[in-house]
Structure formats: structure tokens, C-alpha cells
Design a protein with these regions (language model features):
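Glycine-rich, mobile lid/loop segments that gate access to catalytic sites or pores
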Residues: 104-105, 109-227, 232, 237
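Glycine-rich, charged/polar anion/phosphate-binding loops
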Residues: 24-34, 54-55, 168-172, 185-191, ...
Length: 324
């Protein structure tokens, strides 16, 4: 087994400091070390919710999606989540039936640990492809992570890093009516960054009260203009995943109806803040592109449609002549 020991030089485009983030009501964070691919670092992230959270997701378009992507895509139709589990270092991709079974074993173990249905637990993996997950080590780490669930978003962002040179996070606090709403996102990614996301994971958390179908529609739009609009090396991954979780705890129990329709007047502020967070995360991923020393934004004017404008922009972004 290859041990990932090398220390990566921090990107020259990295932010000078980690952002100050608001707390998100109903989100409990734990991290731990499985000692499976990395030594002496946290590589397991568990996030549990006080109550079932609305969930939305966008996944890789690769025709060979990794085992955890297949698992999440099956679960997402239920619309709600009790927990998120992420392991860094091993992607559980191109691992066949055993990889699918290992993913199921981990989900089954954690769902029993938190007294949840398995279909309400979401699993994500990132790292080296072609290796099986060390299930016993991960199970032990999951228990430690869950029992120590008093970590912050910075710890969470660090735990999911692989070849990243800095932890990535973004947050917004807005007011909807009389209620203060928080939106926080974390992400990882630095190589295999191409449109239709990248070798990347991104997780968005909010305490807004929003129905799953509407949340999914907003996430789709947000991904289109953020993670699906970046490129470093034009390669797409098998594990790309963006998941959004809405606990509703900033609004629930206050005689406030959930946001459920696109015409809801409260939605404008929320959508704008959500897209700001996602765009910030996407830009941070590009700034951490392997070997990147420059960041450019391509603007296309007078195109006949958004899709045609994007085709032009992507062809420019992926051109070796432009990059050199």
C-alpha cells in the first residue's frame, strides 16, 4: 500500500486565512483518524443531524461512478438525511462488487450506531482509485468520530483533504423575515478539475427550512454556475459529489412554513447566498489546482444562449495554448 507522506507546498493562490463561519443549527461534526492511508491525521468525517434534514445532490456524469456515488444516488430519492460519512485517502472506485459491499457495510454500521435507517445515511469517499476500503479501521474511526462530535467546520474541511494544499470553506448569514439563516459549505479538490464538477466533494449545510424538491432545484442551478463552470486540467472524476443538507432548525417550531415553491418571496435571498457560497468554493478549488499559479475568469458576451456561451468559455479554458 502506498503511504501518502509527502507534504504539499501551499498554493500561491491560497487565501491568507481560513474564513470565519457562522454556526449551523442542528449540525454535529466529528472527525477521527483511521490510519489507513494517512498517518497522524484526521481522515474520517461524520456529520449527524438532530432531526432528518432535507437533502439534495448532484453527482458525477462519469459512466463508471464509484461505489459511494452509486449508494448516494439510490438514497437521494428519499429526500432526507440523518448523517453524512466521508473518508479521505481511498476513493472506493473501480473496486467492483467488493467495493459496493464495503460501502454497504460501513453505512450499515454507522446507521446502527446512530439509530438511523441505512437509506438516510450518505457515504462519500475520495483518494486513490483501485484500492479496497479497510472496513475494520474505518468502523473504529467512525465510532470515535461520532463519540467526539464537537468539532468545527475547519476540522471538517481538513478531514476531507487529499492533495489539497489548504482547507476550503465558505459561509453566509442572512435574514429571512425575523429569522437568521446560516449557510456553510466545505469542499475538497485540486486535481482532475473539469466541467461537470471535478475530482471534488462539496457539502453545503443550512438551517433554513426548505422542502427537498425545491432544494434540489436550487442546488442544480447553483452547481451549473459554480462547480460545473471551472476547469484546471479538463479531467472528470468517478467520485464527484455535491450534497446539500437543510436542517430547518432556524425556522422550525416558529409557525413558519417551509420554502416549497420557486415563487416563494423568501427564496431570493436564500438562493443568492447559496450560490455565493458555492461559487466561492468552486473558485477556491481552482486556486488550489495542482501547479496553478494564475486564476482567470472568462466572460463571453452576446452569446445566443447560456449553453453556447459555456461551450466557448470551456474551449478557451481547456486550450493548452491559453494555459501556456
Amino acid at each position: 500500500i502506498i503511504r501518502l507522506k509527502m507534504k504539499l507546498k501551499k498554493s500561491p493562490l491560497a487565501p491568507t486565512k481560513f474564513p470565519t463561519l457562522p454556526s449551523v443549527k442542528g449540525v454535529n461534526i466529528g472527525t477521527s483518524a483511521s490510519n489507513s492511508k494517512y498517518k497522524r491525521r484526521q481522515d474520517i468525517l461524520t456529520i449527524t443531524f438532530n432531526n432528518p434534514a432535507s437533502v439534495a445532490g448532484v453527482f458525477t456524469l462519469s459512466q463508471m461512478p464509484a461505489a459511494p456515488v452509486q449508494f448516494c444516488k439510490k438514497n437521494i430519492v428519499n429526500g432526507y438525511a440523518n448523517a453524512l460519512v466521508v473518508n479521505a485517502g481511498i476513493a472506493n472506485s473501480f473496486t467492483g462488487k467488493k467495493g459496493i459491499e464495503n460501502n454497504r457495510l460501513i453505512a450499515s454500521y454507522f446507521s446502527k450506531l446512530i439509530n438511523s435507517r441505512q437509506k438516510d445515511v450518505y457515504i462519500c469517499s475520495t483518494g486513490v482509485i483501485g484500492e479496497q476500503l479497510p472496513v475494520a479501521k474505518i468502523k473504529k474511526a467512525l465510532k470515535n468520530s461520532f463519540l467526539g462530535r464537537k468539532k468545527d467546520f475547519k476540522s471538517a474541511a481538513k478531514a476531507i483533504m487529499t492533495t489539497d494544499t489548504f482547507p476550503k470553506a465558505s459561509g453566509k448569514k442572512i435574514k429571512i423575515g425575523d429569522e437568521e439563516i446560516s449557510i456553510v459549505g466545505i469542499s475538497k479538490g485540486s486535481g482532475m478539475i473539469a466541467p461537470n464538477m471535478a475530482t471534488m466533494l462539496a457539502f453545503i449545510f443550512t438551517d433554513a427550512l426548505i422542502e427537498p424538491k425545491l432544494f434540489q432545484a436550487l442546488l442544480n442551478l447553483g452547481v451549473r454556475d459554480s462547480f460545473n463552470s471551472i476547469s484546471v486540467d479538463s479531467d472528470t472524476s468517478t467520485n464527484d459529489t455535491v450534497l446539500g443538507f437543510a436542517t430547518g432548525e432556524a425556522m422550525v417550531g416558529k409557525n413558519v412554513k417551509p420554502m416549497s415553491k420557486i415563487g416563494d418571496k423568501r427564496l431570493a435571498k436564500f438562493r443568492e447566498a447559496l450560490e455565493d457560497v458555492m461559487k466561492d468554493l468552486a473558485i477556491q478549488i481552482v486556486k488550489d489546482g495542482e501547479g496553478a499559479t494564475k486564476l482567470i475568469q472568462i466572460n463571453v458576451n452576446n452569446a445566443s444562449s447560456i449553453s453556447s456561451a459555456k461551450k466557448v468559455a470551456i474551449s478557451i479554458a481547456n486550450s493548452p495554448l491559453i494555459k501556456t
